[in-house]
Structures are given as C-alpha cells and as structure tokens.
C-alpha cells in the first residue's frame, strides 16, 4: 500500500453519538455536547487533550434545525484550549469537516481534533413537516425573493432536492433500464438493518410491496426514498498516528480520501445527469491508495435519497456504470448477513434518521471495531468506506484497521 499521503498520518480514535429521535425537543447544544463527550471518552482522552475542533456547517444561516451548534459554541461549553479550529458549509460535502480535521492533524496543527455534526430538524419542523422550514413554505405570503440557484427552481415549484434527484433518477431509468423495484431495495435493505439498531427512527418491517405502494413524492421517488428528519448529534476524534500509544483502543486508520466540487454549483446542470460529484471524489480516492474496491468489506454511503446511494455504488466501482440496479436487485448482495457488500448497516438516513452524513462515518467505525451488536457484519471486517454528499459536492473516506 502507498504510505506517502498525509491522511495516512491520521487515525480515528473514538466516536460518540447522542440520543437520536424523531422529535426530542431537547436543547440542540446539549445533544451536541453529549456526542462530543462520548467521543472523547471512547478515545480514552479528556477535554484537555483536544487541541482542535471542526464542524459542518457551523452556525451559518440555514433552515431552522439544520445545525445544532457551531465550533465556538462547543469550544466555549467544553472550555477547550485550541491550536486550530474550523467551521463552515462551503466544503466537499458534510464529511469535509473530517477531512479538514485530518489535514490539520497530518500537518501538525493539532494532535486530536474533535469533529462533530448535530441537527434538530425534526423538532424544528414540528407538525408542519419540511414545508414549515422552507422558504415560501406557506405558499401564499411572506415569501422572500429567490436568489442564486433558487431563482431557477423556485418559480417552477421545485425548491426541494427531491425534485432535482428525481430528475437524475428518471434519466438513469431511461438510459439503463433501472426500475422502481430495484431502487426500492435500497430502502428495504435500510429498514431491515434499522430493525437491529436501537437508535433508529423507523424499525417496523417494510416489504418491497410496502415501498411500491407508498405515495409518490416526485416521480420516480416514493416516500421511502426520502430520508427522515430527526434530532441528534454525532462526533468523532481524529488523532495523529504518533498518539496511538495513548489511545484506549486500536485506532481506525484513514487509508485514503477523496473530495470533489464539480460542474455548476447546482444539482441540475451536469454533463451527465446519471452521476454526480461522487464520480470524481471516488476517482481521487482510488488514485491515493493501492487498495481496490474488491477489498472493501462494508459500505456506509449517503442516502439522503435512495438514488444517491446507487450513484455512490457505481462511482466507487462496486459495480459498473449503469449496473447499480441489477447489483442491488433482490437485496442479497447488499445484505448485512452474507452479502457481498453490506450496505448502510445502521439503517442509513432513510430509516435511522438524517444525521446528515456523519452517521455513516460513525457506523463504519463501530462496525470496524466490532461494536455494532446485533447488526454487526460477520467475519471481523477490516476495510470499510464512509461517503457523504450528492449533487456538485462529495467526500469519501477509505478506512482500515490495519496497514
């Protein structure tokens, strides 16, 4: 394996997660701190050891509930003494915060960086659902003038990513013969895995017929193709390899990473509507390691909408371009027990809740440490990927317990 990349000076030493719920109605900073303190303890560290902090998206103006706390909030609440910190939304996807932390560690700006993401979208939306927190959600009055990308979608009644992703999925259906029955396997697999996750939002059994009979949101996407807003926080500690003797348990090494910002900063103006920025992020990742897709034993990949996961499967080389439909058909290849590539083993955002990217990295680490309980992938997996992002931005990490 190549050993000359900065990310290979980095390990994940601990992870933590708060309570997760559809609507917890708790102080979002409290949820954030629960996750951060759990991650610090998991690594065998104390707050005095943390000398860096990184988060996405910080406290930037976003729909209510989109962010639970910023870097300064956590810095102050935990009384940290930092040599480096970062927080913001203009990154290659949600995991850009972890990539930033990894680079800070690799280049000597910090030894232990606390990376976190928290949301309280479920409580913020309340009974009004997503429309309650979207610009112009009342549809009649107090609608601000659209600007930027929204100028081109809001007048046509398409302010939601479901509309943009549906357009891409429709093109994939047309070009490659992908079917709703195939797409539905992403959601059915997620629900099956969520049933074994005590923190998952939705755990009731769901058949493919249940999926197909659910209401259509934007053709071809059904209700269960869309992730579930929730409340919760997730955190992880990124540490330098030189600190391994000080850690509580064997660390997870970052073998390679990939990031990308491609095309126009929108979701609808692409050279190829059947793919997204994960095509380029994945190519970058594989160029930074001698490992191959066939060596990956589990994949935790973004499912804000189920079609995004299919794009990740193709981009990462787990199947050929246009072949994600046949790859997931029947669900056997992506099953946690006995599957060729166990996929979204915690239930993903479709059933476990929209922790907005960080939940995938948390689950990959839990699995590689063998701490996933009833949903544990058998055979002591040593290599996994965690990926987040869609549209023009994407980030992915290749993780291993040995090098």
Segments predicted by a language model, with ranges:
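Conserved active-site "lid/cap" helical segment
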Residues: 1-93, 100, 104, 168, ...
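Condensing-enzyme catalytic core mediating Claisen C-C bond formation in acyl metabolism
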Residues: 1-29, 38, 185, 216-280, ...
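Conserved catalytic cysteine-centered active-site region
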Residues: 4-8, 60-126, 131-164, 202-226, ...
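Beta-strand segments within the central parallel beta-sheet cores of soluble alpha/beta enzyme folds
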Residues: 47-57, 84-89, 113-118, 182-189, ...
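Extended C-terminal subregions enriched in glycine
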Residues: 272-279, 283-306, 310, 315-318, ...
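Short glycine/threonine-rich loop-to-helix capping motif typified by GTGT followed
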Residues: 61-69, 267-270, 303-326, 393-398
């Amino acid at each position: 394996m190549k050993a000359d990349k900065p990310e290979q000076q980095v390990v994940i030493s601990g992870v933590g997660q708060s309570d997760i719920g559809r609507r917890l109605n708790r102080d979002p900073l409290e949820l954030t701190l629960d996750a951060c303190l759990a991650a610090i303890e998991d690594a065998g560290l104390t707050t005095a050891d943390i000398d860096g902090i990184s988060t996405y998206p910080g406290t930037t103006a976003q729909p209510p509930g989109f962010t639970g706390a910023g870097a300064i909030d956590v810095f102050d609440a935990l009384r940290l003494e930092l040599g480096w910190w970062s927080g913001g939304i203009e990154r290659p996807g949600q995991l850009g915060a972890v990539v930033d932390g990894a680079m800070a560690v690799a280049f000597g700006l910090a030894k232990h960086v606390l990376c976190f993401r928290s949301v309280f979208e479920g409580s913020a939306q309340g009974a009004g659902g997503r429309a309650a927190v979207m610009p112009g959600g009342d549809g009649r009055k107090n609608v601000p003038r659209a600007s930027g990308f929204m100028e081109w979608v809001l007048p046509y009644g398409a302010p939601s990513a479901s509309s943009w992703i549906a357009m891409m999925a429709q093109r994939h259906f047309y070009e490659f013969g992908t079917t709703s029955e195939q797409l539905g396997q992403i959601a059915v697999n997620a629900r099956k895995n969520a049933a074994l996750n005590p923190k998952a939002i939705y755990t009731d059994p769901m058949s493919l017929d249940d999926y197909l009979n659910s209401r259509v949101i934007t053709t071809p996407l059904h209700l269960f193709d869309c992730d579930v807003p929730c409340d919760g926080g997730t955190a992880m500690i990124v540490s330098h390899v030189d600190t391994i003797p000080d850690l509580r348990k064997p660390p997870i090494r970052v073998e390679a990473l990939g990031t990308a910002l491609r095309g126009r900063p929108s979701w609808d103006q692409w050279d190829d509507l059947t793919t997204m920025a994960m095509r380029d992020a994945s190519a970058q990742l594989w160029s930074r390691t001698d490992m191959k897709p066939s060596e990956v034993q589990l994949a935790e990949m973004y499912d804000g909408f189920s079609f995004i996961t299919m794009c990740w499967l193709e981009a990462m080389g787990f199947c050929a371009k246009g072949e994600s439909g046949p790859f997931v058909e029947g669900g056997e290849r992506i099953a946690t027990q006995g599957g060729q590539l166990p996929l979204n083993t915690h239930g993903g955002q479709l059933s476990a809740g929209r922790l907005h990217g960080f939940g995938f990295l948390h689950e990959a680490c839990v699995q590689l440490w063998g701490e996933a309980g009833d949903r544990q992938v058998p055979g002591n997996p040593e290599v996994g990927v965690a990926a987040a992002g869609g549209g023009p931005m994407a980030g992915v990490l290749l993780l291993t317990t040995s090098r």
